[in-house]
Amino acid sequence: MDYRNGLRRFNTDRRSRLFPSSAFGFLLALMLFSLAGLLPWKQWFVLEGNWKNGEITSAVGKLYDKEHPARNYAVGLWALVSYTLFGEGQKGLFVGKDGWLFIKEELEPSAHEHQEVEAARELIEIVKSHFAENESQLLITVIPAKWRVVPENLGEKEIAPDIALRRSYLLDAFSNKQAVGQQDIAVFDAYETMRDLGEKAFLRTDTHWTPQATESVAERLSQSIRQQFTDLSYDQTSFEWQRSDPEIFRGDLYNFLPLGRGLEMFGPSPDLIETKQLVLTHEAINGAINNTENILFDGLSFPVNLVGTSYSANERWHFADALQKSLGMEIPNHAQEGKGPFQPMLEYLVSEEFIESPPELVIWEIPERYMGVEGNQKVLEEYRSKQS
């Protein structure tokens, strides 16, 4: 049974029954009546912005920060009208078809797009140079943008050329050798795998992929690794999934729709996300007990390490777990949330763990959108300041 589609149909039908188009006028009148009593009239004549890009909602929120404790209720009403009448959320959110939400930094060039791309390229060259100086090998896993996997859910939204080129920029950065001694960099592009999954690849209300997508990507990535890196010790242990019932999940993009309690039912339907846990099989547990003496004398060895973003760091998606299961080995996870792909890698390369015991292979997960978003120049400047 497709739980996500079932929940979507249920909530869509429910909204159509509870909130028909004939009620829009009533809602608008109620909202204006409520807010008129809470804000001085003179404040309404200084509101600047555009309904359709969320600026009015943000402006009302700022007024309530200063004027009245009923801010959450008022802003929730404004957000509801903006979403239901205009199909828009707060600034930073794009509302697609059938309740699909997208973050605008994936759809629109940043203020300094070209400079951020150049900074990303330089950071990549720095990382490549580090690996050229040691025996560890690097494998890049490119995560496609959400819009690229489900473009049909964008509606009439057009993608700017700079945005469409981000994936090519990233792939090209690892195919070019700009320094003497740089080794070939293995690249796994997850686009085909995720495109095959269609709407099951990404969560509708979140920027991230689904647990089903991480399993599929990890399986195909593991096949590629086994073919390219034949000397690694695979299948040293065995894992299995303990699966539970799906849970209702409201993703991070709900933050751009501050409907508040009581109004969420009129917003996009939440996702249903698979819940599971990776555990050792009974055979693996028995084997670990028998090998305890060898581990004590020889120490632990982890031939593969993972570095990346919240796509790998957040345990809700289970990417690191899926890789461990597919490769049959424990994989230390150095991914971090909220830092993009470059900062965690630079920190890992100077860590005691990497310097004293470099692994045979490092998997570096990079979402394509980070080639142009704000922040790459800052990471590069901080790196340069530490080197000087």
Predicted feature descriptions by range:
Residues 1-388:
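Extracellular glycan-modifying ectodomains
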